[in-house]
Amino acid sequence: MTAITDIIAREILDSRGNPTVEVDVYLEDGSMGRAAVPSGASTGAHEAVELRDGGKRYLGKGVEKAVEAVNSEIYDAIGGHDAENQIQIDTIMRELDGTPNKSRLGANAILGVSLAVAKAAAEASGLPLYRYVGGPNARILPVPMMNIINGGAHADNPIDFQEFMIMPVGADNIRDAVRMGSEVFHTLKKELSAQGFNTNVGDEGGFAPGLKSAPEALDFIMKSIEKAGYRPGEDMYLALDCASTEFFKDGKYVLEGEGRTLEPEAMAEYLAELAAKYPIISIEDGMGEDDWDGWKYLTDKIGATTQLVGDDLFVTNSARLRDGIRMGVANSILVKVNQIGSLSETLDAVETAHKAAYTAVMSHRSGETEDSIIADLSVATNCGQIKTGSLSRSDRLAKYNQLIRIEELLGPQAAYAGTSILKA
């Protein structure tokens, strides 16, 4: 009854107005799963590869080739297979593609099918997706990393670091966490406006003011947390995504907004200073994706007290993660389904992290859709943290709203991760 009977892919638009792939998977019993694929702006060199059309249409970003791959070659390979055999289906698609980075058929094609298959199987089983994927023990609601000031590749301003986030660790539940984040977000808007900064938002819904340095952004956030009635370092903590690969040039970190260039050790020292001065509990991509020595130095320096998240470093790839674990580099992995290109490989990366006592943070991309699957996956994996943007833009809020629904469905079983994520 859960055999795949039809697959239909189409080209839709993401939150940046760029084309992306949406896939519908139909099963023998009439169940249907629909998934839309996200896309990143700051992408790691080691990520699985999206298939784009090139040419003039959509300025080269069309995905008709990926859509055609789904509707023909992929359907021919997995049509008739049981949707409940997720690993088998993902393996068939990976082998059909035949490249190490899914570049022939496109990670966007393979991922769209992979996620839609899981959604269809969940519907056929009569279970919500988080329960279907995670089983009976899936019940942890994640602490959100809320990106309220954007810089770097996500905004047109001088700030070098890409994301400045708040984490409402002191909330009692996900509803309170969202409320607390919203209150700080709107307080920050007033603070920025009062000092003459624009309050336009970036790709992920955070503000993109013309600030020049990380401390300047952090000071605004600290003040806004306090003005909203919360205590930095108790109710709310801070997190950074430096996206350092974006400004790692010729072996050095070029902070153009701050007007200085740092050697890897000096960059690590700078991050350590920020973590000591502010209640920062998580730093993502503090060093460049191939600066393994810099990562090791940073980990040795502050890894015992600070979550050090590898995004471009690990690209949701279990093999790269195992390299990092062996070298004692970082202590957490950012999990983005489209970096690796299938659901089963995504879940394997989370499992690999947890077995090594690394944390995992479920994450969106800067180019998102209304699809809220990462909310379900964050609960399914009990990873305890989610990164899905700010408290504006419906493509971001879709995930927060889904978490609120999941918490309601779980009832008394629901547990908010809260202070359990703190390292020290």
Swiss-Prot record:
UniProt xrefs under Pfam families: Enolase_C, Enolase_N
Q: Which InterPro entries match?
A: Enolase, Enolase-like_C_sf, Enolase-like_N, Enolase_C, Enolase_CS, Enolase_N
Q: Which reaction does it catalyse?
A: (2R)-2-phosphoglycerate = phosphoenolpyruvate + H2O
- Name the pathway: Carbohydrate degradation; glycolysis; pyruvate from D-glyceraldehyde 3-phosphate: step 4/5
Please list the residues that make up the active site.
E204, K336
- Which residues of the sequence carry a binding annotation for (2R)-2-phosphoglycerate? Q162, K336, R365, S366, K387
Please report the name of this protein according to its UniProt entry: Enolase
- What taxonomic lineage is listed for the species of origin? Bacteria, Pseudomonadati, Pseudomonadota, Alphaproteobacteria, Hyphomicrobiales
